[in-house]
């Protein structure tokens, strides 16, 4: 969160807190239980949302019979999610919702002082809940390091009495460790989630479908018992499609008569790439992360134990270390997958390599209503062929030096005839004109080359920024999205039905 964002957040929260306080002042409160504590703020000392560096939400899942404990914490590098190996959190909106709830939240009226009524009001502490528990609330806690700034157990909702505003929804709530249950006015309660997907930037590729220029499908199966790629990869199909001006084309499909590209399917592919959302993540081994940040998966691998650790991690997700023979008896290592890969080329020269791994069945399976999810290995790289190389203008040769005619008798000691003044003047004019042409061509070419080099440097920088985010993680995507982007020829090539002859055009 930038300083400007923090400032705007603080100002917005101050206004929200004031509005809530005004709405919950004494008018109409006499229709709620009044114990003399009504109208007081729960957390009078908690006024600065920027003071919190830890947010904890605990919610009881009755179906699973266990509490879901979700935590977001901040460091100098930003907000992260400890439960998911410190994956970066996109927490601004969520934090605003939570802080808006707890800053200035007022006790509208006391409902009960009886600990035995907590179940009835739905404010049982989820941290103490056990399988079979009911009436359990949602615990929201903001803290600074080990110091709790504000915490509240939010229970059942109910319609506000007519004296307040019957269109508003109120909640029962209490502070952990205290028996009193109060009615409170809280907003955005349903938006406070313990689900990983609600706290991260879902568009993790940061890919704009309007910048897609080329898609290459490399569909293959991998025999993990083999290590040499020429033996291990069973090629199913390789297809390259270009996209420009709203149309798809391909020069290597060799389509038969009646075949054409299915624009709807390919447009859905572009949409799916743009909407490629995370379901879960798992961290890669540090050897692999460090190497990827330098442009190659095996850049920093120095010994066999490191390579074995990487290979073991990859294999568990459906990715493998393949070997490609190189000149001089050398071997190049390469990451491959058991479900092929797709390369997405962008207008700026960046290419995404997306490799598809094994089916994933993890703790976020309830997020994926369409069925099994799948591991995805994503890396960015530069593809210079995506950028149009500059067409340089030929630079003309300089005018050769003016020739001096030899002496008539060939005697080297004879005086050299004086050059013709008119010829010399004409030569100088041509020489200067040519020099101007040369300078203009060189300057134009230099400008074109600089513009091209700037694009290359920008692409390299973009690749570095993307891999800094992508390198540490195995991603998990939904099976529904996987089916939209993992296409074979039969999926995006359609066959037109032959036109049946009618009585008017039937052969005679």
Residue ranges, per PLM feature:
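Secondary-structure "cap/kink" motif recognition
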Residues: 1-508
């Amino acid at each position: 969160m930038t300083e400007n964002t923090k400032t705007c957040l603080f100002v917005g929260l101050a206004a929200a807190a004031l509005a809530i306080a005004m709405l919950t002042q004494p008018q109409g409160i006499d229709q709620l239980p009044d114990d003399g504590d009504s109208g007081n703020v729960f957390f009078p000392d908690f006024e600065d949302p920027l003071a919190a560096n830890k947010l904890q939400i605990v919610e009881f899942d009755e179906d699973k019979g266990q509490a879901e404990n979700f935590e977001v914490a901040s460091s100098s590098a930003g907000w992260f999610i400890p439960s998911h190996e410190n994956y970066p959190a996109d927490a601004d909106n969520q934090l605003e919702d939570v802080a808006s709830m707890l800053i200035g939240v007022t006790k509208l009226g006391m409902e009960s002082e009886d600990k035995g009524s907590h179940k009835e009001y739905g404010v049982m502490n989820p941290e103490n809940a056990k399988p079979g528990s009911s009436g359990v609330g949602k615990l929201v806690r903001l803290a600074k390091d080990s110091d709790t700034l504000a915490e509240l157990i939010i229970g059942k909702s109910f319609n506000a009495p007519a004296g307040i505003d019957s269109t508003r929804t109120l909640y029962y709530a209490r502070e952990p460790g205290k028996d009193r249950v109060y009615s409170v006015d809280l907003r955005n309660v349903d938006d406070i989630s313990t689900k990983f997907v609600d706290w991260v930037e879902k568009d993790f590729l940061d890919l704009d479908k309007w910048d897609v220029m080329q898609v290459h499908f490399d569909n293959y199966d991998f025999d993990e018992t083999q290590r040499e790629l020429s033996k291990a990869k069973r090629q199913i199909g390789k297809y390259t499609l270009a996209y420009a001006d709203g149309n798809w084309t391909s020069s290597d499909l060799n389509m038969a008569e009646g075949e054409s590209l299915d624009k709807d399917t390919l447009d859905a592919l572009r949409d799916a790439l743009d909407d490629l959302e995370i379901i879960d993540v798992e961290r890669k081994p540090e050897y692999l992360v460090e190497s990827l940040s330098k442009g190659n998966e095996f850049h920093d691998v120095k010994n066999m134990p490191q390579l074995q650790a990487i290979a073991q991690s990859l294999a568990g997700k459906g990715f493998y270390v393949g070997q490609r023979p190189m000149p001089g008896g050398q071997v190049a290592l390469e990451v491959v997958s058991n479900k092929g890969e797709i390369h997405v080329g962008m207008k700026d020269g960046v290419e995404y390599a997306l490799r598809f791994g094994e089916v994933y069945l993890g703790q976020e399976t309830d997020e994926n209503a369409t069925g099994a999810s799948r591991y995805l290995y994503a890396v960015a790289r530069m593809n210079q062929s995506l950028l149009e190389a500059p067409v340089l203008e030929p630079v003309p040769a300089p005018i050769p030096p003016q020739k001096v005619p030899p002496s008539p008798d060939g005697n080297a000691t004879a005086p050299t005839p004086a050059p013709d003044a008119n010829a010399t003047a004409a030569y100088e004019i041509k020489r200067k004109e040519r020099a101007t042409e040369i300078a203009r061509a060189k300057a134009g070419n230099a400008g074109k080359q600089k513009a091209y080099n700037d694009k290359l440097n920008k692409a390299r920088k973009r690749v570095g920024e993307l891999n800094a985010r992508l390198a540490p993680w195995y991603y998990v995507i939904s099976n529904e999205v996987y089916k939209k982007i993992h296409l074979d020829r039969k999926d995006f090539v359609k066959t037109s039905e032959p036109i049946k002859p009618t009585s008017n055009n039937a052969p005679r």
